[in-house]
Amino acid sequence: ATDVYPPKDLGELYKWKSFGVNATEFDNQVMNPRYFKAVCPGRGSQQHWFEAQEAAVEIFGRGRGCITNVVAGCEPLGGMIEGIEERMSKGVYTVPMTFGGAPGSPMAGMRPPGAEWYVEVAEKVVDIYFKYADTLDVNLTEDDRWGYTRRGQSWFSAPSDDEKSRRLQEMGKLPPGLPRQDGIDV
């Protein structure tokens, strides 16, 4: 997937496909338009990002065709979850990532939410994933990219991956065992 700003002319996405691109990643960072202006200054209209994601879904496919990351912890839970559901309903595979204010950035002093908050995010987002799973061209039991389930491999900044793996294990669709870290034998 190409992880870039969306082109101004969304028709360019057809050219990308002709060059061999098979997916896009247009990261929202946040779902609420007011937070988008504050957190993502200089990125243009959030509406254009949404339109680009929807165009990518039409061109590259539902689920695999367009991925977006949301930084969980930069906006209130309710609005973020509503936004994630809205994107997933349109075929945009949305992955919440844990917030960490980078040193030297305007958000350096902002404290991330606690672990319980992230557990709640993971549970609610995974409910959304399973609600729309049959409408997406993604097989959660086989796709090993981060943001999906990575076949039971843990990914530190996307806790919803571990929750998806846990539920798939309960359903008998993934082998038993805790999510694992690559290269670490336990």
Predicted feature locations:
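Conserved AdoMet/S-adenosylmethionine-binding subsite of the radical SAM
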Residues: 1-110
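Auxiliary Fe-S-binding modules of radical SAM enzymes
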Residues: 55, 59-60, 77-186
